[in-house]
């Protein structure tokens, strides 16, 4: 049986062999691995890029005080970004399942069409959910637009839901029963040992104690700071301010402080920031001459 951390190590080893830069999680609150600069920003422009990383993801509204066996306000994704998307991307994915000990001939693996959209990022793509014996474990996406900019070349994104994948591999019904590691002297460390208290306390904070007045003020500050930084222009710091605004919105949403009509307006404000950041980042790479594209050409010429 693979432990939770062995699943991560296996995926790291597999995607390392496929030429991916193995990166670290983005060190800010994000709702999904797509928000990492290694995906959102690197999907913009013509430069080639391959990366893989674990991303802790926060969705405050999904908290259940640690009482739901498969719904969390903090969970893990394993993200793979391939640009340009290779024609054999599905075969590469199946290869990763084999590395995890999943024999495609012995399991029901289905690709269910499910086009993807993230309104706050101004991003969308053609995609599929991957169902393993009736459980969704992965999302495939071919990005068409990011930050309102067309993706040329197309970026392929593979997002594994690590908890769901681990629940299948370990054959458990509750995320809290997952074995994180075997531990010293055979003393198992379970997911509940690592995260259950965090789920209880963060859910309590998100739903009951987060200050709406403070969060509204923070949102306005982060929005203003992102706009100011784009005028400099500093695309990457501006993106971080936009991410902070997005997480603040998610906290307000969980707190029930935003009405249905206000929600659409706030999403629009974040989307406008994302689009402006995307353009600023593209412009900054263009000013640099798209260095990774030039580097690839130089390497080819040298060969």
Swiss-Prot record:
PROSITE patterns on file: AA_TRNA_LIGASE_II_GLYAB
EC assignment: 6.1.1.14
Chemical reaction(s) catalysed: tRNA(Gly) + glycine + ATP = glycyl-tRNA(Gly) + AMP + diphosphate
Molecular function GO labels: ATP binding; glycine-tRNA ligase activity
GO BP term, pick one: glycyl-tRNA aminoacylation
Keywords: Aminoacyl-tRNA synthetase, ATP-binding, Cytoplasm, Ligase, Nucleotide-binding, Protein biosynthesis
TM annotation in the entry: none
Any one cellular-component term (Gene Ontology): cytosol
Protein location: Cytoplasm
Chief location bin: cytoplasm
The protein's assembly and partners: Tetramer of two alpha and two beta subunits.
Family: Belongs to the class-II aminoacyl-tRNA synthetase family.
HAMAP family: Gly_tRNA_synth_alpha
UniProt protein name: Glycine--tRNA ligase alpha subunit
